[in-house]
Every structure is written in C-alpha cells, then in structure tokens.
Amino acid sequence: MSIPHIAPVPHPRDGYYATNNPYQVNGPKGFTEFKYLEETHDLFVRLDFPGIQKESVIILLEPSKKAVIVTGEAPKESKHDSSHRKYGTATGLICDCCEISNIQCFVGDGVVRLILSKQKINLRVPIFCSCKITNLQNVLFFCLIFVGGARMPTDASPNIIRGYNPEDLSVELLLETSLRCFSIVNVSDIFHGFVLLIPIVAVAGGHPLAHLRGLNPEGCRGTDPFDPAFTGPTIRPHPSVLEGSTSAYETKQLSNGGLYLRIDMPGVPSDGFIVAVDGNGVVTIMGRAPATMHDSNGFYAMNNPYQANGPKGFAEFNQERDCGYPLTLLEPSKKAVTVTGDAAKSSKHDASNRNNNIHTFVEDGVVRLILSKKKIYPHAPNFCSFGGATIPTGDAPVADGTPYVNLLAHFRGLIPKGRRCTDPGDPAFTGPVVLPHPSVLEGPMMPYETKQLSNGGLYMRVDMPGVPSEKFMVAVDGDGVVTIMGRAPVTMHDTSGRTYVAKVANVPRGYDGGRIKLVPKHGVIRLTIPSN
C-alpha cells in the first residue's frame, strides 16, 4: 500500500501561521528579519536560505559601499530532490551621507545572519539624516534593494569573499582585504532574475519596502517578525530563490509505495529534529530552532510555554447567534455566571489539588459554555453584547441611566475592534513571560511542575488543555532530549485546534524511551522518567 502524503491545510479563518512556511507554528515569521541594534547602531539581518552550505556563500560589497549582495547554493542532497537551489538577495543604505564599513556573516542550519556597520562620509549633512534613528521621525537606515533585472555599475570591479570562516575573520572593511578578494566578470548575472518584492510585501504597510516595518511609524527599530501581515491563506514562494524550487516542501511517491519528503525548517540544528508516530498512524516531524544571536524570541502564548499554535489566552469568548443552553448557577442579578471546578491531585507527586474558578461541556481539561440572553430593557439600543463588549460611539445609556461599562477589559478582543468575540490570536498574548493562571483559586498556578525523585528520576506535570489522552506523544531524540507533543482538536465553537510541544528533560544517549511512564488525563500529562 502506498504511503499517502498529508498536505498542509490553512486554518479556515486565519490561514497559515507563517506564509513563508506551512509547517511553522510559532516564532518569527517571514523569510527575513531586520533589527536595529541600539547599543552599536548596526543592523542585524536574518536570511532564511534552507539547505545552504557555508562554503558556497558569497558576500559582495557594491563599489559605492551602499549595497551588500549575498548569494549561496543549496546542493541536491538526495536523488529524489527535484533540483539544487541557488539563493540571492541584497540589502543596503538609503542615505547619501554614510557607507557600509563592516560586514560580519554567520552561516548555520540554513540561515545566513549578517551584522552590517556604517560610517558617515559626508560630515556636512545635518545630524538628522535618513540613516539615523531618532525618536521623532524614525527611519531605519538600511533597506532591501531587490529590483528585477537591475544591473551593477560597470566602471569599477566589485569585491567578493568566498568561503571565509566568520570565526577567523569578521571581514573588516571588505575593500581592504585584497588578498581574499577577486573580481566577478559578469556582475549582472548576480542580479539577473531577482524577484521584485513589492507585490509580495506591500500588505505589511504603505512603504514600497514595507516588509521593513521599521520604515513605518508602527515600528522604528526593525521589522516586526510577528506582523499579522505574514499570516494568511496562501504560502508565498521564496523570493530569494534564483534557481530551483521556491516551495518550502516537496513530495515524491516512490515506486515501492514509499513516500519521500523534503521539508524546509531553517534554523533547526541537525540534532533538533524528532519524528513520532501517534496511535492513529500519523507521522509528525518536529523541529525547534533556537534563538541565535539577535533573533527575535518569546513565548507564542503567555498562558503556556509549551503551546506552539492555535488560540492563545486562558479563555476565549465567541458570540454566536441562535444558540443557547439552560444555566443553573447564575449570579442573583442574572448578569454573571460563576464557574468553579476542582482538579484532583492525580499523582502523589503533584504539589496539591487545584480549584479552578455548572459543569456543562467539560472535556480534556476545558470547560465550554453557551450562554443565552434575553432583553429586559426593551428601550435600550438594539446593539448589545455579552460582558466586556463596548457599544458604538454615541449610543445612549441603558434604560436605568447607567452607561455601558467595560468590566472585562482584559479581554482585549472585545475592545474596540471585536464586539462579537475575543481575539485568541492577539499579539498581546505573545511575550517573554509566562503568566500564572488567573482562575486558579487553590494550588499551583503555573502550567507545569517538576520534582526530582529520590531514586534520581524526574516527575513532571504539564498542562495541555484540550488534548485527548490518545493524542499525546513522547519521543527521545539522538541527543537524549525528551519531547512531549499534544494536539488539541477543534471542539464546538473553538477558533481552531492547538498544538503543544515541550522539551522537558535530558537523558543519556541510547536511553530506552519505553521506560518513561505516561499518565495523560483531563488535558494534563504526567510523566515519570526513571534514572538510567
């Protein structure tokens, strides 16, 4: 029997998390990232070139020292690959008063990272210029200069460096390293076929190079790798691929019924991949790309450090029409519903039981309610909503003279853009700190706890609400890293499903993962890892 491929499918409402890669579920989005470094006034550039080899990288400084061109090749590693891939891109200055003075380049795991420095060459220019960041008119001093069919000046030979080791040399002033430089005869070949990026990235803002979000008032220190503009229903072809496949993956059905897959996961080290098969025979590949140098970082969801995609936050509100359910525990004014429940201490190693602040639709650690309402002030405005939603500007107060008050303002989606639901994809729920659960009245408020056992083993409790018991997987990679993965399906009116990925422990190489004891129950997985 042939092995079928499960093609990636976008979420029906939000689309793919990152339009640059259908398999990316969290972290910085986009093929590139630009960041202004406050402490050095340099520019950090991240370029995703999956499959690229360090020795193939070419750095070219244009003679005027205004532009840097980066090219490299990803060879055909497997006979089943459709072809090799060649990459090319450029970045440079937008002012006339400065020039690029230094380039540092670091290549690893399919990612090229640059640090570009500049120096002023026209001292008569006022202090404020387009290449200086100020707190008033903030303009990033570098910009991408992709132009289809552009030609380099021919009156001077550019200089390039091949195959250098950035650990040995930071490439100080490229034009002065003449012993390692040589000329390219046909420079135009480097630019030939470059893709014009404007149609691809114009959605991110008004500037024609708007994927450099730092050029817009919204962000003055670099691009925004979490920009919602990089989320959508369509996967973009890689704009820097000059030759070969521009897709983030390719598949091939083999003659023996097998399946070949090539998947780009730039930034993931060779030892950072895990393949697991769940109880339904679904093969899942996981890869974690650590933050390197100045890469953007942070938790996808501040409610859970292990959540990788899906609705964020501890609660989600969605106002549906013509749906209801009888309620029995109402606050006397019939304006509020109080929900309580106990999470029992299921293991002797748990710190304590937990009391979470009507058991209606309760499954896998998630309580879902459907609330119905009826109007008691017939003369009130027609527009009204559940607690937390604001009314349009200018609407009159309710019949008793009390104005509408937003008592649940922490539901950011209700103010003022969404009057029908919270926004579980709100960037406000992404950040560097994991928040304690606000509804826990007794017991631990964090989504995990650990305990070192007296026999040298490790006990862990990890919250993955919404994940059924049969949807948990545990794998041990070649470096002995224990990873837990859980997939929470869409239920009732949930915005979408959720995926959790947790690297929880290090065991010796060759450790038998079958020794790990798993107890999944009510959206919580408890595992005991015996010592070797």
Curated annotation (Swiss-Prot):
Residues 25-134, 439-532 form the sHSP domain. Disulfide bonds: none annotated. SUPFAM superfamilies: HSP20-like chaperones (SSF49764). Belongs to the small heat shock protein (HSP20) family. This is Putative 57 kDa heat shock protein. It comes from Arabidopsis thaliana (Mouse-ear cress).
